[in-house]
From Swiss-Prot:
Residues 1-26 form the signal peptide. One of its GO terms (biological process) is triglyceride metabolic process. One of its GO terms (cellular component) is very-low-density lipoprotein particle. It holds the Pfam family ApoC-I. One of its GO terms (molecular function) is fatty acid binding. Keywords: Lipid transport, Secreted, Signal, Transport, VLDL. This is Apolipoprotein C-I. Belongs to the apolipoprotein C1 family. It comes from Leptonychotes weddellii. It is found in: Secreted. The lineage of its organism: Eukaryota, Metazoa, Chordata, Craniata, Vertebrata. InterPro entries: ApoC-1_sf, ApoC-I. Its main location: secreted. The keyword Transport applies.
């Protein structure tokens, strides 16, 4: 009984595989793909630019750069004073 049911299923699956891709699933032509590359690159560039601007603006708005600058300045002055006292 199993063999009787599996043979028609196997034939249908084999027919579907051998008929190839449907027209909507077929690969697009190379010329149309190459024609869309500049648009895709421009879209990618614009997206990247927007994200970079947002990241830079976020960094400018935060207080991390000011804290870092102050820490380096204080550390530099401490080292400078220690060197003055050591070599005086």
């Amino acid at each position: 009984m199993r063999l009787f049911l599996s043979l028609p299923v196997l034939v249908v699956v084999l027919a579907m595989v051998l008929e190839g891709p449907a027209p909507t699933q077929a690969a697009p032509e190379i010329s149309s793909t190459l024609g869309r590359i500049p648009d895709k690159l421009k879209e990618f560039g614009n997206t990247l630019e927007d994200k970079a601007r947002a990241a830079i603006e976020s960094i400018k708005q935060s207080d991390i750069p000011a804290k870092t600058r102050n820490w380096f300045s204080e550390t530099f002055h401490k080292v400078k004073e220690q060197l003055k006292t050591a070599f005086s």
